[in-house]
Design a protein with these regions (language model features):
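Glycine-rich phosphate-binding/hydrolytic loop that grips phosphoryl groups
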Residues: 23-30, 69-73, 81, 183, ...
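Glycine-rich phosphate-binding loops at beta-strand->alpha-helix junctions
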Residues: 1-3, 152-155, 159-181, 195-196
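N-terminal glycine/serine-rich phosphate-binding loop of ATP-dependent small-molecule kinases
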Residues: 1-21, 182-186, 190
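Non-catalytic structural scaffold of enzyme domains
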Residues: 8, 31-33, 56, 68, ...
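Conserved phosphate-binding catalytic cores of ATP/NTP-utilizing and phosphoryl-transfer enzymes
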Residues: 12-40, 45-54, 201-207
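A short acidic Gly-Thr/Ser loop motif
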Residues: 40-45, 63-66, 167-168
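Glycine-rich phosphate-binding loop plus the immediately following alpha-helix
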Residues: 54-109
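Adenine-nucleotide phosphate-binding core of ATP-dependent small-molecule kinases
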Residues: 111-161, 196
Length: 211
């Protein structure tokens, strides 16, 4: 395991805990004034951070994120460019691969017919699909997973919105999946320009405030 040294070219290195960097990054980027909020760092994986009166805590995380998306995309379609992947996903139709609730059982409670019942299930009977459709389904699935863990933690903390940092939500195909899943719990996803730098900005801000 590699560790960051305490000195670099005789300059002291200030180390900031990632949880604090995520929470502080969201607070500064979005100029959050609420005493309690939830920040979601959606990057290679996904981490959820809560803030209560400037105390940051790690709610949990999952290994599914942008790394998963690019890895599976490369394995299945030989495409490992995020921009190309996103463009193709937006051109595809995930309904050619995914089964929707309306196709299976109609409405279930508050779940409307267009919600996914099973990702990729239609490939069981038909393996001939375009890369665009595959990437549309894959991007949506990653978005649904991120959206689900986001709204569950929002409900846990009794907030009605989550603030995103990290690069994955720059991919519109993933962001659409996140927002559809958040809407199931009436949770709003908040996105701001430069959110891909949120963790780095948070580390800088936290270091300035505490040193």
């Amino acid at each position: 395991m590699m560790y960051l040294c305490d000195l670099y070219n005789n300059v002291p290195v200030i180390k900031v805990n990632e949880v604090k960097a995520i929470g502080c990054g969201a607070k500064n980027l979005y100029e959050i004034e609420e005493a309690s909020y939830v920040a979601i760092s959606a990057g290679t994986g996904t981490a959820c951070v809560a803030c209560n009166d400037n105390v940051f805590s790690h709610l949990g995380g999952i290994s599914v994120g942008g790394g998963t998306l690019l890895g599976l995309s490369n394995l299945i379609t030989n495409i490992n460019s995020a921009d190309k992947l996103d463009k193709m996903a937006l051109e595809g139709n995930r309904k050619n691969l995914d089964a929707l609730i309306g196709e299976v059982v109609n409405d279930i409670g508050s779940l409307y017919p267009d919600i996914t019942a099973s990702n990729f299930v239609k490939s069981v009977d038909n393996t001939s699909h375009s890369n665009e459709d595959i990437l549309a389904s894959l991007s949506n699935m990653i978005g649904e997973v991120i959206g689900t863990i986001s709204y569950l933690n929002a409900l846990l903390m009794n907030v009605d919105k989550v603030y995103f940092v990290g690069r994955v939500t720059l991919l519109e195909s993933v962001k659409k999946g996140i927002d559809k899943r958040l809407s199931l719990a009436n949770i709003s996803g908040i996105y701001k320009e430069n959110r891909e730098f949120g963790n780095a900005l948070g580390a800088i801000a936290y270091a300035k405030e505490n040193n």
